[in-house]
Design a protein with these regions (language model features):
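A short beta-strand element within beta-rich, extracytoplasmic domains
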Residues: 1-9, 97
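Short active-site-adjacent helix-start/loop capping segments
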Residues: 10-13, 35-36
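Short consensus segments that form the blades of beta-propeller domains
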Residues: 13-19
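Aromatic- and Gly/Pro-enriched, solvent-exposed loop/edge beta-strand patches characteristic
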Residues: 19, 27-122
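Hydrophobic residues positioned within well-ordered beta-strands of beta-sheet architectures
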Residues: 24, 78, 152-154
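Proprotein-processing/basic-patch segments
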Residues: 91-160
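A short, hydrophobic C-terminal helix/tail in secreted or cell-surface proteins
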Residues: 162-180
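Short, charged juxtamembrane terminal tails flanking transmembrane helices
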Residues: 183-186
Length: 186
């Protein structure tokens, strides 16, 4: 799952407690783009330039974001439960999270959708291990937006993938168990 921290309640005029979006598309990929402002691979404001070859749609559909609106919250209350797994290897590049609200999507509820209701931090000065964003409030007809070292505070909940050696050992153990059982019954 992916979760975001809501802004504290002093920003309630921009947030509200709940907002529903009729359709979002969430993709994950690895990317050569960097969060380091001084890097020649700094995240591009041309969105397609950031997406890796292993791009995977991990969620698509309606979603409701709800917050308790408590003062100075540090809880990650805006949650997207992913429907498709993504295997990330740091050696393949940086992790790119891309959230798109397709043209024609609607919102309802007292809150707003976009950059305003989520808490963010600035990675200034930028660093290779930091975070960066590219964003666009316009339509899909505008594939170029803005980029920044300010980034949404995001929590990724992960499940480690079993190592190939672990799977092999489990297979060897299973074969040995079956062989032992056959000897006892013979």
């Amino acid at each position: 799952k992916v979760a975001f921290r809501a802004k504290p309640s002093q920003f309630a005029f921009a947030i509200g407690n709940s907002v529903t979006v009729s359709n979002i598309v969430v993709t994950l990929s690895t990317t050569a783009s960097s969060a380091d402002f001084n890097s020649p691979n700094y995240i591009s404001n041309t969105f397609a330039n950031n997406v890796g070859a292993d791009v995977t749609t991990v969620y698509s559909g309606p979603i409701t974001f709800t917050t308790s609106g408590t003062v100075n919250t540090t809880a990650f209350e805006y949650v997207i439960n992913l429907s498709t797994p993504f295997l990330y290897s740091k050696g393949a590049g940086n992790l790119l999270l891309d959230i798109t609200t397709p043209d024609g999507s609607t919102t309802s509820g007292p809150g707003s959708v976009g950059y305003a209701p989520v808490d963010y931090a600035s990675d200034s000065p930028s660093s290779p291990d930091g975070a960066a964003i590219a964003f666009n409030g316009a339509t899909s007809a505008s594939p170029i937006g803005s980029n920044s070292v300010a980034s949404v505070i995001t929590q990724f909940t992960t499940t480690p993938a079993p190592e190939p050696a672990t799977l092999s050992m489990a297979g060897v153990g299973l074969v040995a168990l079956v062989a032992r059982r056959r000897r006892k019954t013979a």
